Amino acid sequence: AKQTKYIYDILGGDDGRKLYDAVQKGIDKAKALGADVIIGLGHLGVDPSSSPWTSEEVIANTTGFDAFIDGHSHTVMENKQVYDAAGKAVTLTQTGSYLANVGKMTLAEDGTITTELISTADVSDAAVAATAATWIKEVDEMLGEQIAVTDINFYISDPATGKRRIRSGETNLG
């Protein structure tokens, strides 16, 4: 069997073309069903190590998106403009990580799409904070509780070569 970057398939193919084609079919279908605005929602990221399956590459190899909300790389990204295959600017956004921001996307009557990241650092709700504190206390009390034991060491990397096995091959966990 041919060794590839990952052992699973996201319809990406080696060059991303399968993914781009599948996404384009989805965009075309949404338009055929009468969608006025097409907003992609993905978990692709923009990290070069994910190439050719990044949100920027999906946008660049398709037409029809008006905006794209992304994740995976946990990038703080507001109002980034990426050009699609037809040269149209598409708004790309991500909120970062650990709920540090909440994203707000505004669709204006003239078709303009803007995004804003609202920091959660300055936002607090007493009732939510109390509920969270209670839940966190319960979880903290459970931490350290032994629920199973095994004599087998589970490996992320191959112990003989040091090569990472997760997502690229079989591990002794499965």
For the regions a language model picked out, list residue spans one by one.
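Acidic/His-rich catalytic or pseudo-catalytic neighborhoods
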Residues: A1-V46, A85-G174
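Beta-propeller domains
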Residues: D47-S51
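Conserved beta-sheet core of the metallophosphoesterase superfamily
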Residues: W53-T106
